[in-house]
Amino acid sequence: NSRRQRQMCIRDRCKKVRKISYLELKQNVAKLAGALKGKGIKKGDRVIIYMPMIPEAVVAMLACARLGAIHSVVFGGFASSELAVRIDDCNAKAIIAGSCGLEPGRIVPYKPLLDEAISLAEHKPDFCIVYQREELRADLIEGRDFDWNDLVSEADEADCVPVRGEDPLYILYTSGTTGQPKGVIRPVGGHLVSLNWTMKNFYDIHPGEVFWAASDVGWVVGHSYIVYAPLVSGTTSVLFEGKPVGTPDAGTFWRVISCLLYTSDAADDC
């Protein structure tokens, strides 16, 4: 409805607050889905997402879901060897990556790690989409790598592809600390129903309220409670890049809570 379209669905951290409405998110997702569709991505294809904690990571996840493609998010900055294992295991048709991530006191280049992972992997993706960040732009390999903004600017919005409730939504790999990483598959229907139930019955969170899971989209808590649970329940999700106990200091955690969870939406000076 019109109220939901205007509602904030994602807020990107305090001091540098970026607000994204449900309507804006839907438009961004549909455009990226159109770009993926134009590159041949279809229902059932696997797409690896190798991005930092930025709204574009959420857009990438939802764009895959919009096409019925299966996303597999790999924790941003993971070693090339670990990324290569996941490329081979899921036979990724495409990879969506960020040019870099931001950590306390440093910038982490992602593209060199991605390039090395692809060289190590036996399976080669058809193409990569790179979201270029102002902090560090990446060199693109002609014919394989494509600029996110260039593709999206030329794409038409893609409609939702119907899927069955038992169709896979995503593959998320275990850490691999006790052996070979194992890909856990979650289905579309039951997973979303259960997440919506937990928001109401575990957390007492309702539409229009603000929810912050201080995790990462590369882990299951981030999948569940940064992305899918808040969105399916109509709440506003907080997305934070960096370490909330150390970017720049341990007080950041409480500043974000004070600014975004307990401050009026009109307070633009957070």
Labelled PLM ranges:
Residues 46, 52-80, 90-95, 209-210, ...:
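A short helix-loop-beta submotif of the ANL/AMP-binding
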Residues 192-210, 220-261:
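Conserved AMP-binding/adenylation subdomain of ANL enzymes
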Residues 3-7, 11-19, 27, 31, ...:
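N-lobe entry segment of adenylate-forming
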Residues 128-131, 142-173, 180, 190, ...:
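Conserved pre-ATP/AMP-binding loop-to-beta segment of ANL
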Residues 66-150, 254, 258-264:
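Structural core segment of the AMP-binding/adenylate-forming
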Residues 11-62, 79, 83-84, 140-150, ...:
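Conserved AMP-binding/adenylate-forming core of the ANL superfamily
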Residues 13-14, 171-183, 199, 263-267:
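Conserved adenylation A10 loop of the ANL superfamily
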Residues 1-6, 10, 262, 266-270:
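Single conserved hydrophobic/aromatic residue that forms the stacking wall/gate
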